[in-house]
């Protein structure tokens, strides 16, 4: 391909609209200035994780939610809300995106005890005090677009914007805290939206929007303005940025015939066009980072061509019936997966990636670059990709039984897994992970081992899927330091608290998965007062009754000695100290009976003993480094952070 064409392709990928965009791009991330002591950090982080785990289903169910978790000065107050013009799908996606960013304010990152993230589609906040009735705070922001209106339309635009701001502050209160509309006079249109958070009563909404109207006045000659307050959100723009426009207009005579509407939540997908000027700004301000991303995209394109991995975007559209909901197999924080049938009759799984931020580049590059270079019976096989359409697509072999999570906890039309199948699934998963860690040409940490990422073939051979969060592990490092990414409940304590990543983080995740499969129960360590299945198994192990933890649906139809051995291995994998967890190759040998099983010496994560251990880990410098200097040059620092809701 000519170099000019390739460059145009790359630029097009950065600025093309995506039908999957949910206005999730961050407008502002604000971390407060209240710090916490090292002794309290682990408990505060634990309460934060539980609160985040609990607030997500509330937002998914009704568009907003608040959660209080913990006691005393370690209490975490959490809140999330979507802008009311978003449909449910876009609300869920938007919230997943900003939820991934708020941990950057956590004590192990910034040393603070509160933070909030504003996007143009949703909002999230956590703090160590009850902020639910706040209308204003010292951290409120006014954000004006850098470009001003010029020429003969400047005065008209300013007047229209001022009128619209007045309309929004009045009509939103009348309409239950939400208003979206526009003013169009003298052929100049200004669009706007205002919303009070559900935590405010009517008087609080009036106060918040009244103050927002004053603050946004400083932006009236700019192309766009926003006010980000503790109790409300207000925005105007030259562009229509909301869904299903209302009819709030002013006629050319300057009358006051304003009709406010509450926009209905729709099933349409949000189209959020990245402006060319914004793309140019990013290219100038982040030149080095864009060069890296271009290099990655060029590598992807050459890799796809060299290995015959290229698929036509149009063919994949037709194969999935244009991404019909009836063909949808599932959705995570990085994209949706659809069943498709190619023209040759082959059934495939097509992953449709969301790429409205830099994150899609890393995720897509990881998937194609890593999984195309590994080959194992327990890894999902990548068949190809498409990077020539409006969004990036990955094509995998189709696994009929879907995920282990669905088979255990969702599907009601299947027989429960018997003991032999559970053993086969656990062993196959362990063998696949041992290959990734030690046997492949690359040293790969998956970072997101969980039930929903284990797919099952017809004969129940497990396949490890989703390499979007995977990391290559340098041969000359004992660990790398990275922002946390993964799934709550499966992440190792040293990774949650310090961002310290080794293969042993995957081992911990495997241990959780292993115990979940054997017990038929999910690990609820991050749900307040729910208890942890890891703690339950440990307690039974201490009293020599560990076989009682086996899924009761099996009755007596399982090998008690074998079950006890596997649960003991699971406990070894979830020990609080990472250096006491076995390597995956050792796990495989212990499962096959060719190696003695050691005795766990520590309780699993989140019981009192492990909390003490976490405190020690946070207060003690790391000693397991590639040299004794302790220099930060021993680390590779990664900036991205990504959570997928469970």
UniProtKB/Swiss-Prot annotation:
Name of the protein described by the UniProt record: Cysteine-rich receptor-like protein kinase 3
Gene3D superfamilies: Gnk2 domain, C-X8-C-X2-C motif, Phosphorylase Kinase, domain 1, Transferase(Phosphotransferase) domain 1
GO CC, alphabetical: membrane; mitochondrion
Enzyme class: transferase
Subcellular location: Membrane
Domain of life: Eukaryota
Cytoplasmic side of membrane: 282-646
Modified residues (Phosphoserine): 452, 481
Protein kinase domain: residues covered: 323-578
GO molecular function, one term: protein serine kinase activity
Glycosylation sites: 33, 69, 73, 133, 153, 167, 187, 201, 243, 247
Region (Disordered): 621-646
Lineage, opening ranks: Eukaryota, Viridiplantae, Streptophyta, Embryophyta, Tracheophyta
Segments crossing the lipid bilayer: 261-281
EC number(s) stated in the UniProt entry for this protein: 2.7.11.-
Residues that coordinate or bind ATP: 329-337, 351
InterPro entries documented for this protein: CR_Ser/Thr_kinase, GNK2, GNK2_sf, Kinase-like_dom_sf, Prot_kinase_dom, Protein_kinase_ATP_BS, Ser-Thr/Tyr_kinase_cat_dom, Ser/Thr_kinase_AS
Positions bearing Phosphothreonine: 482, 487
Bias (Polar residues): 621-640
Family the UniProt entry places it in: Belongs to the protein kinase superfamily. Ser/Thr protein kinase family. CRK subfamily.
Residue positions, PTM Phosphotyrosine: 396, 495
Topology term for the membrane: Single-pass membrane protein
Domain Gnk2-homologous: 25-131, 139-241
